Amino acid sequence: MITFQLEQGEKLFIPFMTAGDPSEEITIDLALSLQAAGAHAIELGVPYSDPLADGPVIQRASKRALNHGMNIVKAIELAGKMKKNGVKIPVILFTYYNPVLQLDTEYFFALLRKNHISGLLTPDLPFEESSELQKNCQSYDISYISLVAPTSKERLVNIVEQAEGFVYCVSSLGVTGVRQTFDESITDFIQQVKQLSHIPVAVGFGISTREQVDSMNKLSDGVVVGSALVKKIEELHDQLLASDTRQDALREFETYAKTFSPLYSFK
Protein backbone atom coordinates (compact mmCIF):
# COMPACT_ATOMS: atom_id res chain seq x y z
CA MET A 1 0.00 0.00 0.00
CA ILE A 2 1.08 3.57 -0.64
CA THR A 3 0.84 6.16 2.12
CA PHE A 4 2.55 9.49 1.56
CA GLN A 5 3.58 11.30 4.73
CA LEU A 6 3.98 14.82 3.36
CA GLU A 7 5.55 17.57 5.44
CA GLN A 8 3.77 20.93 5.61
CA GLY A 9 3.96 22.45 2.13
CA GLU A 10 5.68 19.39 0.61
CA LYS A 11 4.51 18.49 -2.90
CA LEU A 12 4.51 15.13 -4.67
CA PHE A 13 6.65 14.45 -7.75
CA ILE A 14 5.56 11.22 -9.46
CA PRO A 15 7.36 10.52 -12.75
CA PHE A 16 6.27 8.01 -15.40
CA MET A 17 8.63 5.82 -17.41
CA THR A 18 8.11 3.02 -19.94
CA ALA A 19 9.44 -0.38 -18.84
CA GLY A 20 12.25 -1.53 -21.12
CA ASP A 21 12.91 1.75 -22.96
CA PRO A 22 15.67 1.87 -24.04
CA SER A 23 16.54 -1.42 -22.24
CA GLU A 24 15.78 -3.25 -18.98
CA GLU A 25 19.16 -2.44 -17.48
CA ILE A 26 18.91 1.26 -18.34
CA THR A 27 15.32 1.44 -17.03
CA ILE A 28 16.81 0.56 -13.62
CA ASP A 29 19.47 3.28 -13.97
CA LEU A 30 16.83 5.83 -15.00
CA ALA A 31 14.65 4.87 -12.02
CA LEU A 32 17.60 5.48 -9.69
CA SER A 33 18.13 8.87 -11.36
CA LEU A 34 14.47 9.76 -10.78
CA GLN A 35 14.78 8.73 -7.13
CA ALA A 36 17.88 10.91 -6.78
CA ALA A 37 15.94 13.78 -8.38
CA GLY A 38 13.40 13.65 -5.55
CA ALA A 39 10.62 11.42 -6.90
CA HIS A 40 8.14 10.19 -4.27
CA ALA A 41 7.06 7.20 -6.40
CA ILE A 42 7.55 5.91 -9.95
CA GLU A 43 4.85 4.94 -12.42
CA LEU A 44 6.25 2.06 -14.46
CA GLY A 45 4.35 1.79 -17.74
CA VAL A 46 3.70 -1.58 -19.36
CA PRO A 47 4.14 -1.09 -23.13
CA TYR A 48 0.99 -1.89 -25.08
CA SER A 49 0.26 -2.05 -28.80
CA ASP A 50 -3.03 -0.10 -28.59
CA PRO A 51 -2.49 2.59 -25.93
CA LEU A 52 -5.71 4.64 -25.96
CA ALA A 53 -4.63 7.21 -23.38
CA ASP A 54 -1.10 7.79 -24.67
CA GLY A 55 0.14 10.46 -27.03
CA PRO A 56 2.83 9.95 -29.70
CA VAL A 57 5.85 10.20 -27.35
CA ILE A 58 4.77 7.35 -25.08
CA GLN A 59 3.45 5.38 -28.06
CA ARG A 60 6.94 5.47 -29.60
CA ALA A 61 8.51 4.41 -26.28
CA SER A 62 6.04 1.51 -26.06
CA LYS A 63 6.89 0.43 -29.59
CA ARG A 64 10.63 0.47 -28.84
CA ALA A 65 10.13 -1.56 -25.66
CA LEU A 66 7.81 -4.07 -27.35
CA ASN A 67 10.37 -4.51 -30.13
CA HIS A 68 12.87 -5.51 -27.42
CA GLY A 69 10.47 -8.18 -26.12
CA MET A 70 9.04 -6.31 -23.11
CA ASN A 71 5.67 -7.54 -21.81
CA ILE A 72 3.60 -7.29 -18.64
CA VAL A 73 5.34 -10.16 -16.82
CA LYS A 74 8.80 -8.82 -17.65
CA ALA A 75 7.72 -5.30 -16.60
CA ILE A 76 6.57 -6.58 -13.20
CA GLU A 77 9.81 -8.53 -12.77
CA LEU A 78 11.72 -5.40 -13.80
CA ALA A 79 10.12 -3.58 -10.85
CA GLY A 80 11.57 -6.28 -8.58
CA LYS A 81 15.01 -5.77 -10.13
CA MET A 82 14.67 -2.02 -9.58
CA LYS A 83 14.01 -2.69 -5.90
CA LYS A 84 17.00 -5.05 -5.62
CA ASN A 85 19.22 -2.39 -7.20
CA GLY A 86 18.38 0.37 -4.74
CA VAL A 87 15.01 1.87 -5.68
CA LYS A 88 13.39 2.52 -2.30
CA ILE A 89 10.39 4.61 -3.35
CA PRO A 90 7.06 2.93 -4.26
CA VAL A 91 6.65 1.54 -7.78
CA ILE A 92 3.19 1.79 -9.36
CA LEU A 93 2.39 -0.48 -12.30
CA PHE A 94 0.64 1.51 -15.05
CA THR A 95 -0.99 -0.97 -17.42
CA TYR A 96 -3.91 -1.20 -19.79
CA TYR A 97 -6.47 -3.76 -18.73
CA ASN A 98 -6.12 -6.17 -21.65
CA PRO A 99 -2.62 -7.43 -20.67
CA VAL A 100 -3.97 -8.07 -17.14
CA LEU A 101 -6.82 -10.15 -18.58
CA GLN A 102 -4.32 -12.39 -20.37
CA LEU A 103 -2.96 -13.54 -16.99
CA ASP A 104 -4.52 -15.67 -14.29
CA THR A 105 -5.71 -13.28 -11.56
CA GLU A 106 -3.99 -15.07 -8.69
CA TYR A 107 -0.75 -15.37 -10.67
CA PHE A 108 -0.87 -11.66 -11.59
CA PHE A 109 -1.32 -10.44 -8.03
CA ALA A 110 1.19 -12.91 -6.59
CA LEU A 111 3.68 -11.59 -9.16
CA LEU A 112 2.96 -7.99 -8.13
CA ARG A 113 3.54 -8.83 -4.48
CA LYS A 114 6.67 -10.89 -5.14
CA ASN A 115 8.20 -7.94 -7.04
CA HIS A 116 7.29 -5.34 -4.39
CA ILE A 117 4.86 -3.33 -6.51
CA SER A 118 2.95 -0.92 -4.26
CA GLY A 119 0.26 0.38 -6.61
CA LEU A 120 -1.76 -0.48 -9.71
CA LEU A 121 -3.24 1.94 -12.25
CA THR A 122 -5.39 0.83 -15.22
CA PRO A 123 -6.25 3.95 -17.27
CA ASP A 124 -8.77 2.30 -19.62
CA LEU A 125 -10.85 0.46 -17.00
CA PRO A 126 -13.94 2.49 -15.99
CA PHE A 127 -14.43 2.94 -12.26
CA GLU A 128 -17.77 1.07 -12.43
CA GLU A 129 -15.98 -2.03 -13.75
CA SER A 130 -13.01 -1.93 -11.36
CA SER A 131 -14.52 -3.39 -8.17
CA GLU A 132 -13.04 -6.87 -8.68
CA LEU A 133 -9.58 -5.44 -9.31
CA GLN A 134 -9.91 -3.16 -6.27
CA LYS A 135 -10.87 -6.11 -4.05
CA ASN A 136 -7.87 -8.10 -5.22
CA CYS A 137 -5.60 -5.11 -4.64
CA GLN A 138 -6.85 -4.85 -1.06
CA SER A 139 -6.25 -8.58 -0.51
CA TYR A 140 -2.65 -8.22 -1.68
CA ASP A 141 -1.99 -4.91 0.11
CA ILE A 142 -1.63 -2.97 -3.16
CA SER A 143 -3.07 0.53 -3.65
CA TYR A 144 -5.50 0.82 -6.56
CA ILE A 145 -4.85 4.29 -7.99
CA SER A 146 -7.96 6.09 -9.27
CA LEU A 147 -8.05 8.50 -12.21
CA VAL A 148 -10.55 11.35 -12.14
CA ALA A 149 -11.26 13.51 -15.18
CA PRO A 150 -13.16 16.78 -15.70
CA THR A 151 -15.99 14.80 -17.32
CA SER A 152 -16.66 12.62 -14.28
CA LYS A 153 -18.11 15.16 -11.84
CA GLU A 154 -21.24 13.11 -11.10
CA ARG A 155 -19.12 10.08 -10.27
CA LEU A 156 -16.48 12.08 -8.44
CA VAL A 157 -17.71 11.48 -4.91
CA ASN A 158 -17.74 7.67 -5.32
CA ILE A 159 -14.35 7.53 -7.03
CA VAL A 160 -12.57 9.80 -4.56
CA GLU A 161 -14.19 8.08 -1.56
CA GLN A 162 -12.64 4.73 -2.57
CA ALA A 163 -9.32 6.12 -3.81
CA GLU A 164 -6.04 4.88 -2.33
CA GLY A 165 -2.46 6.18 -2.38
CA PHE A 166 -3.26 9.39 -4.21
CA VAL A 167 -5.99 10.65 -6.52
CA TYR A 168 -4.68 11.04 -10.08
CA CYS A 169 -6.42 14.15 -11.38
CA VAL A 170 -6.42 14.31 -15.20
CA SER A 171 -5.64 17.91 -16.17
CA SER A 172 -7.18 17.74 -19.64
CA LEU A 173 -9.23 15.47 -21.83
CA GLY A 174 -7.66 13.43 -24.59
CA VAL A 175 -4.34 11.61 -24.67
CA THR A 176 -1.18 12.23 -22.68
CA GLY A 177 1.44 14.55 -24.09
CA VAL A 178 3.15 17.89 -23.72
CA ARG A 179 0.72 20.83 -23.50
CA GLN A 180 1.39 24.55 -23.53
CA THR A 181 -1.83 25.58 -21.80
CA PHE A 182 -4.65 24.08 -19.74
CA ASP A 183 -8.36 24.85 -19.71
CA GLU A 184 -9.23 27.41 -17.04
CA SER A 185 -11.94 25.11 -15.66
CA ILE A 186 -9.19 22.81 -14.35
CA THR A 187 -8.73 25.13 -11.35
CA ASP A 188 -12.31 24.62 -10.14
CA PHE A 189 -12.13 20.90 -10.85
CA ILE A 190 -8.93 20.36 -8.83
CA GLN A 191 -10.35 22.38 -5.94
CA GLN A 192 -13.48 20.23 -6.02
CA VAL A 193 -11.43 17.02 -5.91
CA LYS A 194 -9.26 18.43 -3.08
CA GLN A 195 -12.35 19.19 -1.00
CA LEU A 196 -13.62 15.63 -1.39
CA SER A 197 -10.33 13.77 -1.00
CA HIS A 198 -8.88 12.28 2.19
CA ILE A 199 -5.55 11.54 0.43
CA PRO A 200 -3.16 13.65 -1.70
CA VAL A 201 -4.34 14.85 -5.11
CA ALA A 202 -1.74 14.83 -7.91
CA VAL A 203 -2.31 16.35 -11.35
CA GLY A 204 -1.08 14.73 -14.56
CA PHE A 205 -1.46 14.60 -18.37
CA GLY A 206 0.57 17.27 -20.14
CA ILE A 207 2.81 18.70 -17.39
CA SER A 208 5.96 19.65 -19.28
CA THR A 209 7.53 22.78 -17.75
CA ARG A 210 8.61 23.99 -14.31
CA GLU A 211 6.09 26.85 -14.62
CA GLN A 212 3.28 24.31 -15.05
CA VAL A 213 4.57 22.31 -12.07
CA ASP A 214 4.59 25.43 -9.87
CA SER A 215 1.13 26.42 -11.11
CA MET A 216 -0.39 22.97 -10.46
CA ASN A 217 1.37 22.69 -7.09
CA LYS A 218 -0.50 25.80 -5.94
CA LEU A 219 -3.78 24.01 -6.65
CA SER A 220 -2.95 20.41 -5.74
CA ASP A 221 -0.63 18.19 -3.69
CA GLY A 222 1.75 17.49 -6.57
CA VAL A 223 2.22 16.41 -10.16
CA VAL A 224 2.64 13.34 -12.35
CA VAL A 225 5.13 13.94 -15.19
CA GLY A 226 5.21 11.49 -18.08
CA SER A 227 5.65 12.53 -21.71
CA ALA A 228 8.27 15.21 -21.02
CA LEU A 229 10.54 12.69 -19.27
CA VAL A 230 9.91 9.94 -21.83
CA LYS A 231 10.76 12.44 -24.58
CA LYS A 232 14.05 13.24 -22.83
CA ILE A 233 14.84 9.51 -22.68
CA GLU A 234 14.10 9.32 -26.41
CA GLU A 235 16.48 12.24 -27.08
CA LEU A 236 19.21 10.52 -25.03
CA HIS A 237 18.44 7.07 -26.46
CA ASP A 238 21.72 6.46 -28.31
CA GLN A 239 23.91 7.96 -25.55
CA LEU A 240 22.16 5.81 -22.93
CA LEU A 241 22.78 2.65 -24.94
CA ALA A 242 26.47 3.38 -25.57
CA SER A 243 28.60 2.41 -22.54
CA ASP A 244 31.08 5.28 -23.03
CA THR A 245 28.36 7.99 -22.95
CA ARG A 246 25.83 6.36 -20.60
CA GLN A 247 26.93 8.01 -17.33
CA ASP A 248 26.89 11.49 -18.88
CA ALA A 249 23.44 10.80 -20.35
CA LEU A 250 22.13 9.59 -16.96
CA ARG A 251 23.47 12.74 -15.31
CA GLU A 252 21.78 14.88 -17.96
CA PHE A 253 18.51 13.01 -17.42
CA GLU A 254 18.70 13.45 -13.64
CA THR A 255 19.39 17.18 -14.02
CA TYR A 256 16.38 17.47 -16.33
CA ALA A 257 14.16 15.48 -13.93
CA LYS A 258 15.11 17.87 -11.11
CA THR A 259 13.44 20.72 -13.01
CA PHE A 260 10.09 19.09 -12.15
CA SER A 261 10.98 18.24 -8.55
CA PRO A 262 9.78 20.54 -5.74
CA LEU A 263 12.97 19.64 -3.84
CA TYR A 264 14.93 21.87 -6.21
CA SER A 265 14.47 25.58 -6.82
CA PHE A 266 15.03 27.05 -10.27
CA LYS A 267 14.17 30.68 -9.69
Swiss-Prot record:
GO terms for molecular function: tryptophan synthase activity. Pathway: Amino-acid biosynthesis; L-tryptophan biosynthesis; L-tryptophan from chorismate: step 5/5. It catalyses: (1S,2R)-1-C-(indol-3-yl)glycerol 3-phosphate + L-serine = D-glyceraldehyde 3-phosphate + L-tryptophan + H2O. The active site is at E43 (proton acceptor), D54 (proton acceptor). The keyword Secreted does not apply. Pfam families: Trp_syntA. Signal peptide: none annotated. InterPro entries: Aldolase_TIM, RibuloseP-bd_barrel, Trp_synthase_alpha_AS, Trp_synthase_suA. It is an enzyme of class 4 (lyase). Its EC number is 4.2.1.20. The keyword Lyase applies. Belongs to the TrpA family. HAMAP family: Trp_synth_alpha. This is Tryptophan synthase alpha chain. It comes from Bacillus pumilus (strain SAFR-032).
